[in-house]
Curated annotation (Swiss-Prot):
Gene Ontology cellular component list: photosystem I; plasma membrane-derived thylakoid membrane
Subcellular location: Cellular thylakoid membrane
UniProt xrefs under NCBIfam families: PRK02542.1 (NF002712)
Keyword Flavoprotein among record annotations: no
Pfam families reported in the protein's UniProt record: Ycf4 (PF02392)
Keyword terms: Membrane, Photosynthesis, Thylakoid, Transmembrane, Transmembrane helix
Organism: Synechococcus sp. (strain JA-2-3B'a(2-13))
Residues annotated as transmembrane: 25-45, 62-82
Family: Belongs to the Ycf4 family.
Protein name, entry field: Photosystem I assembly protein Ycf4
UniProt membrane topology term: Multi-pass membrane protein
Biological process, per Gene Ontology: photosynthesis
Length: 189
């Protein structure tokens, strides 16, 4: 699954949806952490109450200190980590869009954050302030494929989301399309 997905393409408007935390891997970890955390919590409580709360094993025979309390501790930690994953999915952290509008000569980057006063992070830049588009390609153990917008006085601003790096051809095509649309140079390819 790509980190940025084209949503609108026209002569005057180019808009890409950026996938935030709603990726398959986050769903997997939310389910795994919640299930594991709940299992460990029930095992720890079973050893404390001397009553079996799990249908597939008999943790009531465990000694509460140290085994039961350790399982309870790890179960609570796992459940909290699972809750965080579910909340990040619900809030769609990091999700948003990149919009390039020729009519207004503006670039709008929008991302979702944590709830509160500044939940929506919105950055706007003029076409005239854009120096170039830069593509970062790094292979190896921790691969990185990203597109950056180089803006005068602001440095490099990432346009791609986090997660699994998209295929090389997809990054190259997206970067070339955005560079043509903005009429700026493309660096790094």
């Amino acid at each position: 699954m790509s980190a940025i997905v084209p949503e609108i393409r026209s002569a005057d408007l180019l808009r890409y949806t950026v996938i935030g935390s709603r990726r398959p891997s986050v769903y997997f970890w939310a389910v795994a952490l919640t299930g594991g955390g709940l299992g460990f919590t029930l095992a720890g409580l079973s050893s404390y109450l001397h009553r079996n709360l799990l249908p597939f094993s008999d943790p009531a025979s465990l000694v509460f200190i140290p085994q039961g309390i350790a399982m309870l501790f790890y179960g609570v930690l796992g459940s909290l980590a699972g809750l965080y994953q579910w909340l990040s999915l619900y809030w769609n952290l990091g999700g948003g869009y990149n919009e390039f509008d020729r009519r207004t000569q503006k670039i709008t980057l929008v991302r979702q954050g944590f709830p509160g006063k500044n939940r929506e992070v919105r950055l706007e830049y003029d076409f005239a302030d854009v120096q170039s588009l830069r593509v970062e390609l790094r292979e190896g153990l921790n691969p990185r494929r990203a597109i950056y917008l180089r803006v005068k006085g602001r440095g490099d601003i990432p346009l791609t989301g986090v997660g699994q790096p998209p295929p090389l051809t997809e990054i190259e095509n997206q970067a070339a399309e955005i560079a043509r649309f903005l009429n700026v140079s493309l660096e790094g390819i």
